[in-house]
């Protein structure tokens, strides 16, 4: 009998494996598609030509590198969202309004508010860019796919 007791004592206790709760259907703000939302701000309408303007892209890429890469990376999630594919998720107006007045957007636009929460309250700094500069960055974003 003692031998049987030893075997029983040496047996590993049964571990109850908890099943993971199914993940909710909530889509992260950075992945959400809101093309009908123009955001809050002075940009009401942006006309995009069917072709990419390479001069604008060059200027936009330079502006992005200088003003945005401390928080945004085009190849990964960082302090702020990755702008790659942004044109498939946000309207041109929303993007420009976010670039031009991130404070107003995070105060009044629900998607921008949700992004602020998703990125742990890291507010986007206002770079005090002109509309023309924001439009150049937008053109650069059109090339990020």
Residue ranges and their predicted role:
Residues 2-18:
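Short, low-complexity, disordered segments immediately C-terminal to signal peptides
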Residues 143-145:
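Inter-heme linker and motif-flanking segments adjacent to c-type heme-binding CXXCH motifs
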Residues 60, 64-75, 95, 124, ...:
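The canonical Cys-X-X-Cys-His
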């Amino acid at each position: 009998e003692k031998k049987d007791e030893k075997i029983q004592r040496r047996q590993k206790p049964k571990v109850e494996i908890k099943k993971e709760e199914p993940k909710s259907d909530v889509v992260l703000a950075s992945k959400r598609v809101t093309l009908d939302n123009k955001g809050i701000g002075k940009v009401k309408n942006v006309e995009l030509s069917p072709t990419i303007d390479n001069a604008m892209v060059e200027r936009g890429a330079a502006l992005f590198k200088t003003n945005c890469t401390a928080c945004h990376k085009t190849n990964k999630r960082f302090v702020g969202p990755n702008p790659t594919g942004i044109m498939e998720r946000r309207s041109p107006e929303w993007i420009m309004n976010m670039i031009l007045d991130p404070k107003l957007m995070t105060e009044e636009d629900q998607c921008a508010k949700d992004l602020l929460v998703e990125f742990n309250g890291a507010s986007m700094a206002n770079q005090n860019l002109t509309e023309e500069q924001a439009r150049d960055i937008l053109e650069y974003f059109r090339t990020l796919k």
